[in-house]
């Protein structure tokens, strides 16, 4: 695994390359790179692309440069509005996330943003999903899980139950003002909340084990639905139907 020194060297070199690239008019640290990373944090950097320059062309060139200089491997891309995020894996399993945005739209999308060079425009921060959205996704996933159990699609049922549990935990995070994204707030939940979800893990990949995990996940969702009381009240009866043994 990568060392802190290797990560710092990669960060400094990438920033050096960016500041020497006339196509990039601004750069910033984002995520944990901006707030103070721990031993295992990855690198998150974002850049503003000059007018008249094509973001795709710049991204392709930077990909080739990182592959040559760092032996980086391109894993996947994520697009959000005009920004493209490209995720790389370097030797030592160091993850490097680079994003590129046209200059006119370059700015902070969240609280973790430290400008290194150039200028940034003021933007509205992207808000976390609403509790109604989280609850609705969890309900959808629980219904799909029960259908998969009846179809004897056991691995797919496990997939939906696990996903529903994640949204139930995200609701618990939302209620306490914790981060709801990618499980980042889960470990900050009170221990009694986490303990109450222990039985939601699928213990055996058979009908009985899946139905038990489904029932426990449903209970966990309803127990943590304080922020969507009216919606939960409308759906509680239907959710309990999912837990009947007979199809």
Predicted feature residues:
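A short, charged helix-loop
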Residues: 104-133
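Conserved nucleotidyltransferase catalytic core and NTase-mimicking acidic/glycine-rich helix/loop elements
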Residues: 122-247
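Juxtamembrane helix-loop transition sites at the ends of transmembrane segments
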Residues: 63-65, 118, 173-174
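Metal-dependent nucleotidyltransferase catalytic core
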Residues: 1-22, 30-40, 47-98
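Short aromatic-enriched loop/helix-cap "lid" or pocket-rim segments at secondary-structure transitions
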Residues: 39-41, 109-111, 186
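Short, positively charged
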Residues: 94-101, 107-109
